[in-house]
Design a protein with these regions (language model features):
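Acidic, surface-exposed loops and disordered segments
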Residues: 1-278
Length: 278
């Protein structure tokens, strides 16, 4: 394998000494851009295969292993799988991924989807009833699996349960009888690849997508949720309270609890009024 001189401008020595969280983000992104987005076009015969196809990802995973970093996490297993698939293609093998094309939902399944999308409401008052940790984890898992630009994997989550912790986050509504999930990001990962300069909008899209998934899963579990945003002062307080580095930034927060209100569902404009045509 011909090793690249640098990856995103980083030498092998720099990659060997890099913070594991940042290296992980670079691996995610390089596997995505150099293998994942190309492999299916290659398999379909729409694109030729380069002799070095997948070698950057293989090089990075070799560094990860040489550093003795764990390989059992799902995201790292995903990376290793793509590296193996790329190697197989590169050496003339044939792939059978065992995956299936999407199929339309059944009418019964669509009823659930419609209930999830069109019945969800923002809930701001909650019963004095604790939310089990098991449900909180399910909600956060949904946020983790939201679409994420370039698969970098910068999103982090903080759970506040105590009233004194709620005060760290500026909110324009009362916050009580709930848990607060704060969607955060490790900006070091974006900056390591200059995404904060090249695609700064991705930062906010990633946080918004995570918050939306959190709200949808909360609704599916019979809980209520309300998505709110906050500014730099809140970011500083949260960072200081948790004792985290300056690159750790909170973006939005979602309050979640057992509903104690049934508000009228807000309505939107007519569909034809919002579709722009020439």
């Amino acid at each position: 394998m011909s090793e690249p001189v640098t990856v995103h401008g980083y030498t092998e020595q720099e990659l060997m000494e890099m913070d594991p969280a940042v290296l992980r983000g670079i691996i995610h992104e390089r596997i995505h851009h150099t293998i994942e987005v190309n492999i299916y076009r290659i398999m379909a015969g729409k694109r030729g295969i380069q002799k070095s196809f997948g070698e950057t990802g293989e090089y990075l995973m070799d560094i990860w292993k040489r550093r003795g970093l764990p390989t059992d996490a799902p995201d790292i297993q995903w990376c290793l799988n793509y590296v193996g698939l790329a190697r197989m293609l590169r050496t003339g093998g044939e792939l059978d991924l065992g995956t299936e094309l999407p199929e339309p939902f059944t009418d019964q399944e669509m009823e659930t989807v419609n209930k999830l999308i069109y019945k969800r409401r923002s809930i701001r008052q909650f019963l004095d009833k604790p939310v089990p940790d098991e449900l909180i984890r399910k909600i956060i898992q949904a946020g983790l699996y939201a679409p994420h630009g370039c698969n970098v994997g910068t999103t982090r989550f903080v759970v506040f349960k105590k009233p004194e912790e709620f005060k760290l986050v500026r909110s324009d509504i009362p916050v009580e009888n709930c848990v607060m999930i704060v969607v955060c990001q490790d900006m070091r990962l974006y900056k390591a690849m200059r995404f904060d300069e090249l695609v700064p909008q991705n930062i906010y899209y990633d946080a918004a997508a995570a918050a939306d998934h959190i709200c949808l899963m909360a609704h599916a579990l019979g809980l209520g949720a309300c998505w709110l945003t906050h500014g730099e002062e809140t970011q500083k307080r949260v960072r200081k309270y948790l004792g985290l580095h300056d690159g750790f930034v909170s973006r939005n927060h979602i309050i979640v609890g057992w509903p104690d209100e049934a508000p009228i569902k807000s309505q939107r404009m007519k569909l034809d009024d919002v579709i722009i045509t020439k």
